[in-house]
Amino acid sequence: MTSSLPVRAPSWVSSRRIFEERLQDLPKCANLNQVKQLHAQIIRRNLHEDLHIAPKLISALSLCRQTNLAVRVFNQVQEPNVHLCNSLIRAHAQNSQPYQAFFVFSEMQRFGLFADNFTYPFLLKACSGQSWLPVVKMMHNHIEKLGLSSDIYVPNALIDCYSRCGGLGVRDAMKLFEKMSERDTVSWNSMLGGLVKAGELRDARRLFDEMPQRDLISWNTMLDGYARCREMSKAFELFEKMPERNTVSWSTMVMGYSKAGDMEMARVMFDKMPLPAKNVVTWTIIIAGYAEKGLLKEADRLVDQMVASGLKFDAAAVISILAACTESGLLSLGMRIHSILKRSNLGSNAYVLNALLDMYAKCGNLKKAFDVFNDIPKKDLVSWNTMLHGLGVHGHGKEAIELFSRMRREGIRPDKVTFIAVLCSCNHAGLIDEGIDYFYSMEKVYDLVPQVEHYGCLVDLLGRVGRLKEAIKVVQTMPMEPNVVIWGALLGACRMHNEVDIAKEVLDNLVKLDPCDPGNYSLLSNIYAAAEDWEGVADIRSKMKSMGVEKPSGASSVELEDGIHEFTVFDKSHPKSDQIYQMLGSLIEPPDPGELVAVR
């Protein structure tokens, strides 16, 4: 019996096989270095004009968010076909570049190529928002004329696109849906999603009940609709009926209860969630929920549990939790997340660092904010604006103006948000003339047209120092209608300088815009009281009563070791309210004369 030695294939055969295998996987590759290496091999083999390979390369570059490179690949092909054009249109659509997608479409027509049943769905993916509705309608007409609506993929894309164009778009989507001779699950789900996004829950539920066949997407979409509108009893009822559930189902319930302020039920749902369904997203939802409510102990405990489970925070999780800390002022949890970041590879992520900077700045820890700001290797405009705003609102106006000067020296061009921060800083620092100069420099120097927010800052700036005539002139000559913020700033200035007559006129304008805001009436009442015009005070209170406007109770909050505690006037909901009122009483009572000690 003889045995033969295995025949070894030449090296060029194995390298070609590897190359072909990589080409097969290319459209799914999101590693830019690997894509670039393969692109270099394609050019070396003179395959860059291959109409089978070029679309794959464009798809891979799209996943890597490198549309400029994708355009270069497209331009290297002398005679593109419809498939190649569709690939580039899709790449622009995936990367939120609608105008570039339509430019490729116009180039396609210049080449004499006809759109197919993939071209329009890719173009429709690029359109989103009410302003795109006329364009979508125009494409709908083209689709009908070309006879492409017989392919169910095309009307499904139209329904999805119409649904992203606001309430009017949803109506057009419904008209198309009702006309369709054939519908699949995607058609039903797209229409259901559109109704849910538009807040049309009754119509959405009717459609859901009519569905001939529901999949998990159908159930989750309807569940999300109830959760978004805080209708958690209906959401729970639907959740209980679900034939199957996944991570999205459980997360929607936890998020819904959390947003509705019912952290007890949010925790019940989280604890009931099967272990395989718990991922970074679900942990983030529950931690951020507790953080938003200022419940430090529970949030801290859950952070410990998540770390112990072996899961690691990703950028999205950190940003969400930091945003919740910012909203509630829960600085200690934000600092805890910061310490975790130092031990992870997220410490250099620009989005994470900006979120951390925002949290410290808004919570008033400006030293930490500056430390984070200085640690950001490549500061973008968001970093500068956040630091400027933090300094401005916390009374460090001069430091903010110095930072603005440094920003300009470093060649960073300010935007409209920058100038809101700068004007607020001038306001807090009493830099009136400088603030006026900055306001007028917006258009003269930076070609930025001031918006209503900037005019509001200018009115507040002038009003604070008693230059009310100038402030009124600004309001009268501004190019847009003054809003509640503008009139509110003027009313605040009237109170500061006891300008009763002007305040009456200002309130009349405020009432036209917002008749139910008790703060405006209270402010005018205080102005009358300061001027000892008690008839005016009585008149305002009478007006409030006749209109059913009630002044909300004043509230204050304090962060202690276990979280944030809030107190309102005559509130007895706190578990230790008896002890609190007893201590408050002892503080109010005058001390015993015998206990007084003379201070020399």
Swiss-Prot record:
<feature type="region of interest" description="Type E motif">
    <location>
        <begin position="486"/>
        <end position="561"/>
    </location>
</feature>
<feature type="repeat" description="PPR 4">
    <location>
        <begin position="151"/>
        <end position="183"/>
    </location>
</feature>
<dbReference type="GO" id="GO:0003729">
    <property type="term" value="F:mRNA binding"/>
</dbReference>
<feature type="region of interest" description="Type E(+) motif">
    <location>
        <begin position="562"/>
        <end position="592"/>
    </location>
</feature>
<keyword id="KW-0677">Repeat</keyword>
<feature type="repeat" description="PPR 12">
    <location>
        <begin position="415"/>
        <end position="445"/>
    </location>
</feature>
<protein>
    <recommendedName>
        <fullName>Pentatricopeptide repeat-containing protein At3g29230</fullName>
    </recommendedName>
</protein>
<dbReference type="Pfam" id="PF01535">
    <property type="entry name" value="PPR"/>
</dbReference>
<feature type="repeat" description="PPR 9">
    <location>
        <begin position="314"/>
        <end position="348"/>
    </location>
</feature>
<feature type="repeat" description="PPR 8">
    <location>
        <begin position="279"/>
        <end position="313"/>
    </location>
</feature>
<dbReference type="InterPro" id="IPR046960">
    <property type="entry name" value="PPR_At4g14850-like_plant"/>
</dbReference>
<dbReference type="Pfam" id="PF20431">
    <property type="entry name" value="E_motif"/>
</dbReference>
<feature type="repeat" description="PPR 6">
    <location>
        <begin position="219"/>
        <end position="245"/>
    </location>
</feature>
<comment type="similarity">
    <text>Belongs to the PPR family. PCMP-E subfamily.</text>
</comment>
<dbReference type="InterPro" id="IPR011990">
    <property type="entry name" value="TPR-like_helical_dom_sf"/>
</dbReference>
<feature type="repeat" description="PPR 1">
    <location>
        <begin position="50"/>
        <end position="80"/>
    </location>
</feature>
<feature type="repeat" description="PPR 5">
    <location>
        <begin position="184"/>
        <end position="218"/>
    </location>
</feature>
<feature type="repeat" description="PPR 3">
    <location>
        <begin position="116"/>
        <end position="150"/>
    </location>
</feature>
<dbReference type="GO" id="GO:0009451">
    <property type="term" value="P:RNA modification"/>
</dbReference>
<feature type="repeat" description="PPR 13">
    <location>
        <begin position="451"/>
        <end position="481"/>
    </location>
</feature>
<feature type="repeat" description="PPR 10">
    <location>
        <begin position="349"/>
        <end position="379"/>
    </location>
</feature>
<dbReference type="InterPro" id="IPR002885">
    <property type="entry name" value="Pentatricopeptide_rpt"/>
</dbReference>
<dbReference type="InterPro" id="IPR046848">
    <property type="entry name" value="E_motif"/>
</dbReference>
<feature type="repeat" description="PPR 7">
    <location>
        <begin position="246"/>
        <end position="276"/>
    </location>
</feature>
<feature type="repeat" description="PPR 2">
    <location>
        <begin position="81"/>
        <end position="115"/>
    </location>
</feature>
<feature type="repeat" description="PPR 11">
    <location>
        <begin position="380"/>
        <end position="414"/>
    </location>
</feature>
<dbReference type="Pfam" id="PF13041">
    <property type="entry name" value="PPR_2"/>
</dbReference>
<dbReference type="InterPro" id="IPR046849">
    <property type="entry name" value="Eplus_motif"/>
</dbReference>
<dbReference type="Pfam" id="PF20430">
    <property type="entry name" value="Eplus_motif"/>
</dbReference>
